Amino acid sequence: MMFIDSHAHMLSRTTDDYEAMAAAGVVAVIEPAFWLGQPRTHVGTYIDYLASIVGFERFRAGQFGIRHYCTIGLNSKEANNEELAEGVMEILPRFALKEGVVAIGEIGYDEQTALEDKYFRL
């Protein structure tokens, strides 16, 4: 039987996890962009992060015969930093057309502010 893991944060997992997934029949994974546990304060950190999930992580999964897809977007916890949010919105198109990107967006609100609403509507 073949499986697709529709929500896995593989960037924070070891390569052993890909090996175990492949052995269990996982053939594809979708990795949603996520909050890294501390606020990103500069657009450069987003560029590094997005480059990792659309590039390196796709390569890493492929080493085990697993197709890696991802979603990208502005995290709700960081939407309230307007300078950062504007910068992220400017760079998202650079990553949106990369192979393996299947969606753009972020689900949910953090503090339900006007800034969060503004950036999620863009």
Short names for language-model regions:
Residues 1-122:
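Mid-domain alpha/beta scaffold segments of enzyme catalytic cores
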